[in-house]
Regions:
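Alpha-helical cap/lid subdomain in secreted, periplasmic
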Residues: 14, 57, 76-239
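Serine-esterase "nucleophile elbow" of acetyl-processing enzymes
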Residues: 2-67, 72-73, 79-91, 96
């Protein structure tokens, strides 16, 4: 395998106003895919369209979200996805946005069942994924959305809960911090806004954001400092 330098957040300083449009890939689970938003396609799709507008930064954004993916599955396809997004002059992507982990945290068949991915194994897998991604290009990580516990189990099998979500997102946040990878803590932000605010932004399954939820998520993402520098238009308005 070709050896690459490790990229830290310090190498994310070039803004789109200072360089040519970037090629960006977003990899992860249904939160990246946009499941639950039949109107606008989720936050990644809306960001992709915004960057295509005449006065925008012109970045190319590939949505590589797969429903149900866990950390190991994202890691397995990461480099292949990265290599196959070459365009002019075989250029590879300039930035990776990761968002994964909630499917690892779910408990199987009952409230006290085993996690889909054992926590110790998850810590190892998320560290490996981040290391792998950093060998390719700079990385940003968008954290998971808190579920509606009252709607569980999902598909009569998966018991998602806040306690496990917190453990898994904290492991991810710490691993990102250790590698100087910017981490957007959506879980803590949304929990702080209260049950009423949060539940209005989830679909009936209690797991996926709805159209309003993805709008809120997009606003959190575009105002996040590590990504905000990539915008040339500060006046973003969702239509």
């Amino acid at each position: 395998m070709r050896t690459f330098p490790t990229y830290s957040s310090m190498q994310l300083s070039l803004s789109p106003t200072q360089c040519q449009p970037l090629k960006i890939i977003a990899l992860g689970d249904s939160l990246v895919y946009g499941f639950g938003d039949p109107e606008k396609g989720g936050w990644v799709e809306q960001l992709r369209r915004w960057w295509m507008l005449p006065d925008s930064s012109g970045h190319v954004l590939y949505n590589l979200g797969v429903r149900g993916d866990r950390t190991q599955q994202v890691a397995q396809r990461l480099e292949v996805e990265f290599r196959h997004r070459g365009e002019l002059r075989n250029r590879v992507p300039d930035l990776i946005i990761l968002s994964v982990g909630v499917n690892d945290s779910a408990r199987l068949t009952r409230l006290n069942g085993r996690n889909c991915t054992d926590f110790a194994l998850f810590e190892s897998e998320i560290a490996s994924l981040l290391d792998q991604a950093q060998q390719l290009c700079p990385v940003l990580f968008v954290g998971m959305v808190p579920v509606d516990e009252a709607k569980m189990p999902f598909l009569n099998c998966f018991y998602f809960n806040h306690a496990d979500q917190y453990r898994y997102k904290e492991a991810t946040r710490i691993a990102c911090n250790q590698r100087q990878i910017p981490y957007l803590d959506i879980f803590d932000q949304w929990m702080a806004r209260g049950d009423t605010w949060r539940n209005k932004r989830l679909t009936e399954d209690g797991l996926h954001p709805n159209t309003l939820g993805y709008q809120s998520l997009l606003e959190d993402v575009i105002h996040w400092e590590p990504l905000a520098g990539y915008h040339t238009r500060p006046d973003y308005q969702l239509k």
